[in-house]
């Protein structure tokens, strides 16, 4: 649906902070997105988190979900960061971690649009590995002009 080249048009992030590798579903009617991040042992964060037992930091799982939600927001508006708008992560509610994400996992990212009030967007997000939830949260983003 969206390869990394198109994703780079919709997210301002770059290595090592671009955490969406591919979008597999984008449903405008359901206002939802499904994407994934392939988690490799070569990720720079594994050098320190934790060398003897590497796990993906929870804050980066949240960031990956927020990036998927950001793509959805841009697509819903038919806009891109190059148009002068960005989404800033401003909060999360109902955050839960259920199991660690390890090197070799494919982290599936799902986001569903919940609401928009003025420039504040809310998304229901979850991350899965092998079909099992590893993280879920309601993510709040602020839309800002550059």
From Swiss-Prot:
E.C. code: 4.2.1.59
GO cellular component, as recorded = cytoplasm; membrane
Which catalysed reactions does the entry list for this protein?
A: a (3R)-hydroxyacyl-[ACP] = a (2E)-enoyl-[ACP] + H2O
* Keyword hit for Nucleotide-binding: no
Listed A to Z, the keywords are: Cytoplasm, Lipid A biosynthesis, Lipid biosynthesis, Lipid metabolism, Lyase
Output the InterPro entries linked to this UniProt entry: FabA_FabZ, FabZ, HotDog_dom_sf
Question: Source organism's superkingdom?
Answer: Bacteria
The catalytic site is made up of 49
Location in the cell: Cytoplasm
Show the GO MF annotations.
(3R)-hydroxyacyl-[acyl-carrier-protein] dehydratase activity
* Coiled-coil regions listed: none
Chief location category: cytoplasm
From its record, what is one biological process in GO terms? lipid A biosynthetic process
Q: Which Pfam families match?
A: FabA
Q: Which family does it belong to?
A: Belongs to the thioester dehydratase family. FabZ subfamily.
Q: What does this protein do?
A: Involved in unsaturated fatty acids biosynthesis. Catalyzes the dehydration of short chain beta-hydroxyacyl-ACPs and long chain saturated and unsaturated beta-hydroxyacyl-ACPs.
Q: Any idea what this protein is called?
A: 3-hydroxyacyl-[acyl-carrier-protein] dehydratase FabZ
Please state the gene responsible for encoding this protein.
fabZ
């Amino acid at each position: 649906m969206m390869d990394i080249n198109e994703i780079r048009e919709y997210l301002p992030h770059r290595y090592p902070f671009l955490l969406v590798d591919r979008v597999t579903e984008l449903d405008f009617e359901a206002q939802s997105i499904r994407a994934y991040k392939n988690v490799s042992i070569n990720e720079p964060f594994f050098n320190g988190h934790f060398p003897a037992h590497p796990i993906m930091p929870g804050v980066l799982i949240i960031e990956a979900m927020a990036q998927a939600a950001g793509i959805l927001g841009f697509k819903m508006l038919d806009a891109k960061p190059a148009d002068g708008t960005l989404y800033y992560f401003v909060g999360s509610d109902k955050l839960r971690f259920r199991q660690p994400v390890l090197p070799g996992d494919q982290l599936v990212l799902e986001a569903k649009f919940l609401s928009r009030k003025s420039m504040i967007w809310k998304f229901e997000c979850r991350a899965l590995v092998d079909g099992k939830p590893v993280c879920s949260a309601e993510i709040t983003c602020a839309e800002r002009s550059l």
